[in-house]
């Protein structure tokens, strides 16, 4: 699966104060409906099914009021991905670290996705291809989260 068709590109402009440099923004592009079946295996290999089950479980545990829903899939321009709950309502994230915040669905989705990738990385065999894919996906999503409007809240909830 080398060519995944996408649509709906979203841009985030990021600039740093240090030396007045501008960094390249990480863009997200929605996965085409016909490519959804191949989306997670492309990024996570055989770990995709465990990731998805864990994501839904952690969403149920830590997101209020979550009881299932439709998730959009997005490719990130840095090689990563994000799954975002398609919901216009605010969601309260009750983090296992004791923090909580009421945020939009995308922010909540980033938080639970980072938690899931982190949790999954501890449960995969060392030096496996799946572990490498999960860790790479975690770091790519974390880079995207650092550029997000709610980056401080995301970091507070996943720390």
Regions flagged by a language model, labelled:
Residues 2-60:
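Terminal domain-start segments
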Residues 3, 17-19, 67, 72, ...:
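Acidic-enriched, low-complexity/disordered segments with a strong bias for Aspartate over Glutamate
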Residues 30, 60-63, 96-103:
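Short, charged/polar micro-motifs that form catalytic or ligand-binding hotspots
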Residues 36, 67-70, 107-113:
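Short runs of predominantly hydrophobic/aromatic residues within well-ordered alpha helices
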Residues 45-90:
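Amphipathic, interaction-prone secondary-structure segments
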Residues 90-159:
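Polybasic, proline/glycine-rich intrinsically disordered low-complexity segments
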């Amino acid at each position: 699966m080398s060519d995944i068709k996408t649509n709906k590109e979203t841009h985030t402009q990021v600039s740093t104060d240090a030396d007045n440099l501008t960094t390249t923004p990480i863009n997200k592009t929605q996965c085409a409906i016909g490519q959804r079946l191949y989306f997670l295996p492309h990024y996570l290999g055989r770990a995709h099914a465990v990731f998805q089950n864990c994501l839904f479980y952690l969403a149920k545990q830590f997101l209020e009021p979550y009881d299932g829903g439709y998730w959009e899939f997005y490719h990130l321009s840095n090689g990563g991905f994000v799954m975002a709950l398609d919901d216009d309502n605010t969601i309260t994230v009750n983090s296992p670290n004791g923090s909580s915040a009421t945020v939009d669905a995308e922010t909540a989705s980033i938080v639970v996705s980072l938690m899931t990738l982190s949790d999954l990385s501890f449960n995969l065999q060392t030096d496996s291809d799946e572990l490498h894919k999960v860790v790479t996906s975690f770091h790519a999503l974390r880079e995207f989260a650092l550029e997000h409007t709610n980056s401080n809240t995301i970091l507070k909830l996943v720390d």
